[in-house]
Structures are given as C-alpha cells and as structure tokens.
Amino acid sequence: MSWADLKLSQTVERSFRAEKASELSLPGAIVLLEGGVVGVIAAKIYAVEPLTLALISAAPMFANLSSFFWSKIAAGRSKVAVACLLQALIIACVVAVALVPSGEWGSFVLVSSMIASRVLLAGIVTVRSVIWSLNYARHQRARATSQLQMINAVITVLISSAIGPLLDTYPNSVAWIYWTGAVLGCLGLALFAQVRVVGEGRQRVRERRERRNPETAMGFLEILKTDRLFRWYQMNMFAAGFGAMLIEAPLIFIITRQMQASYT
C-alpha cells in the first residue's frame, strides 16, 4: 500500500475525498483567526497593548483544554453534525470581524472572535479524531491524516503569505479579506457535510452507555497514571508548547512596534 493509495472502501473513499476537498477551502476562514495573523493585525491596525498580544498568543494553547468539554458534548451525537456546527460558528466569528468597523470596538471583536474560534477549533479536532478512528483502520490512519494535514498546511501557508502583501497594497481591505475567508469557509463546510462515518451507530450507543455509567470509561488522568510512555510524551509536548507561548507575543511586539515593519 503506497502513501497515496489507502485501499479504502467505496463509502470511506467518498468521505475521504470530501474531507480533502474541504481542506482546500475551510482553512481560508480558519487561518484568518490564527494567533499570528490576528496578532499582527491587532498590533498594526488597533495598536493593542502587550497584554492583549500575550492573550492572543496563549489562547490556542489554553483552548485545547476545552477538549474534555467537547468530548462530553459530542458523546452520543453525530460527529459530522457537531463538527459542521462548530465550523459554522467559526465562520460566524470571521463574519463578525468583517462586519465591525475599526476602532476600540473593532479590536475587542477581533480578539474575542479569535479566542472563541480557538475554543471551537479544539472541539473540531476532538470530534474529527473520533471520525478518523472509525473511518480508517490503524494501518491506514497515519497516511490518511497526514494527507489531510499536508493539504491544510499548504493552504494555510499560501493564504497567510498572501495576506501581508495584500494589506501592504490595500491597507483598508481587512473587511474584504474576512468576507472572502467566510465564503471559502462556507464552501468547506458544505463539502465536509458530505462525510459519512462508518460504524457511528455502534459508537454512539457505546458513548451513551459510558455517559450513563461514567465509572466504566477510563479518564485522561487515569491514562496518564497507567501509560508511562504517553505520560512522557505529554510532558515533552507541554515543554515544547511552553517555549512557543513565550516567543510569539514578544516577537510580534518587537517587529510591529519597535521595528515598525510592514505586514510582509
């Protein structure tokens, strides 16, 4: 089996194509609320305080803690429906930024929408992990998810790289950029809605049973206690993330305020 040919069933293959098509457009909305993009816009257009820049940089990390909440919300429910709802709410955050004019109120909406979108994105990641575990066998999963993430990464880099030159050339085009992102997000949402999950009925029954009898489900803390390798992995991820949190906010502040650099 090659990296590209996963030898999926016909149903799963259609869903996989829908997911890949969604990754070509949905990041157009999500990238506009990334910490790096929002941080630069907030610093250059709204001249926000350093504390706000720190909040923008830290929001994605702290938003990941909401995964516990989202796993409970999605338990016993259609995973595609939950993911689509969360995607729609992220698009609403993008539209909110496009609608609000510049000024102090605009900076509040921009930062609030960014934080809300990170929490919602954590829910999408949580739900999609269940979709992937059901649709792709263990020997297929890494290849499938790597293809999806590669598409996502390429589109994210292309769009984020285009935003800087566009704002340098047209400084007042922020609203149009976010409207365009919202349209791309709606297209990605429509494509993702075509995904079907194999064996979801049995999974939902199992989740409802575990929700009624929580003592039968192994929690995250219990896994940390019993799985030494996973515990070590999480400790290293925490250390790596801590370093990333420290550097982004000061970097944005130095480049935009002290160096007075352009968007590019």
Predicted regions span which residues?
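Helix-loop boundary and gating motifs at the non-cytosolic
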Residues: S2-S66, L229-T264
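Glycine-rich segments within core transmembrane alpha-helices of 12-TM secondary carriers
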Residues: A63-S67, T145-I163
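Helix-to-loop junctions at the C-terminal end of transmembrane segments
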Residues: S66-V80, L167
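Cytoplasmic membrane-interface "Motif A"-like loop-to-helix N-cap segments
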Residues: A75-A88, S173
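C-terminal ends and interior cores of transmembrane alpha-helices
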Residues: Q87-W105, P165
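Hydrophobic core of transmembrane alpha-helices in multi-pass small-molecule transporters
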Residues: W105-I124
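Symmetry-related core transmembrane helices of the 12-TM Major Facilitator Superfamily/SLC fold
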Residues: A175-Q194
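Helix-loop junctions on the cytosolic side of multi-pass membrane transporters
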Residues: L189-R208
